[in-house]
Amino acid sequence: MSRLYGAQSMVAPLRRVLVRAPDAAFGSVDPARWHYTATPDLPRARAEHAAFVALLERAGADIIRHDAPLTDRADAIFVHDPVLVTDRGAILLRMGKPRRRG
């Protein structure tokens, strides 16, 4: 049986990666509300994300894209932060920023 989940190493080759591209919510965020220093540059963030995904693909990783709209979750592009992935699934941890909770 193949594993659907697993992230027991921070240095092993990546085989499957969940990504979320910066969307309109990220580009129109109120910096003070999300504790950013400035409004994000959405075109630049999208270009950097695309380059990162291309790098992962060239390295042989299977890319899983989370594209569902999340209108009130500007920080949702950071998919690694609040999750501990195990062989049996993901454990959702406590978000650091109050706006990211819920």
Predicted feature residues:
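The feature marks the mature, well-folded catalytic cores of soluble enzymes
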Residues: 1-102
